[in-house]
């Protein structure tokens, strides 16, 4: 079984499937969607929320004091000073110490009781939730691919690996635009790929534009078949923080 995880700026999602099969299934992740209401959903908002004491919210899946998932997304939008958002894009922000407890970002005199986490800490929590859901579904995690923006530098990639290692996931990194092109290849099949290469004299250059919740990722791929099919990323956008809320 192969597991793929997209640790997104706004949402985290995981999928799994047998290596010899085209069948892919999205992982359903149980989460609080309202007070006292738990639902399994395919999208896990990449948000942590520290409830007010008067709210009495307890997340059965998350270490206190934070609430995770859809309810966290809703409440953090209403009281931004109590929410941790966009941890992924902070991983690539060279202007801050990404292992320091800097999130929630900014000073907020009204929410001084909110614990602060580092971008790596927050990312590890989302991955821990995914791993717990995989374990609950009895899906083995010995072959896990974790996607990252092509624009991530080596530091951001190492920090992403650190977050995965903390929660017991041994992963291989794959650039997100390249993962998207692999999916296109799967959809068009061998015939579609052959037509593409025939039309480009055996070598195609593909520009992949990945517009996400916190990053806009551009990659130029070279696809050739001399003598066998190869895919090389020959250029990537330089802008790490194009888009998002920071």
Language model feature labels by segment:
Residues 20-167:
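Phosphate-binding loop and its immediate beta->loop->alpha context
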Residues 127-132, 185-186, 219-222:
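Short, well-ordered amphipathic alpha-helices
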Residues 1-24, 189-232:
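Gly/Thr-rich phosphate-binding beta-strand-loop-beta motif of the actin/hexokinase/Hsp70
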């Amino acid at each position: 079984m192969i597991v793929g995880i997209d640790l997104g700026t706004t949402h985290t999602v995981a999928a799994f499937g047998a290596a010899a099969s085209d069948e892919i299934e999205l992982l359903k992740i149980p989460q609080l969607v309202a007070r006292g209401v738990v639902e399994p959903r395919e999208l896990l908002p990449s948000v942590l929320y520290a409830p007010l004491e008067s709210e009495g919210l307890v997340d059965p899946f998350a270490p206190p004091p934070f609430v995770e998932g859809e309810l966290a997304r809703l409440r953090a939008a209403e009281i931004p000073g109590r929410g941790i958002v966009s941890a992924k894009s902070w991983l690539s922000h060279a202007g801050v110490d990404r292992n320091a407890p800097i999130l929630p970002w900014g000073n907020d005199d009204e929410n001084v009781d909110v614990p602060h986490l580092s971008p790596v800490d927050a990312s590890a929590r989302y991955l821990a939730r995914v791993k717990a859901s995989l374990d609950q579904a009895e899906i083995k995690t010995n072959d896990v691919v974790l996607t990252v923006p092509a624009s991530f530098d080596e530091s951001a990639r190492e920090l992403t690996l650190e977050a995965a290692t903390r929660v017991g996931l041994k992963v291989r990194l794959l650039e997100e635009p390249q993962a998207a092109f692999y999916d296109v290849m799967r959809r068009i099949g061998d015939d579609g790929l052959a037509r593409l290469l025939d039309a480009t004299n055996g070598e195609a250059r593909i520009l992949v534009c990945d517009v996400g919740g916190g990053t806009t990722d551009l990659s130029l791929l070279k696809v050739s078949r001399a003598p066998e099919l190869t895919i090389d990323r020959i250029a990537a956008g330089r802008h790490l923080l194009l888009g998002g809320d920071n």
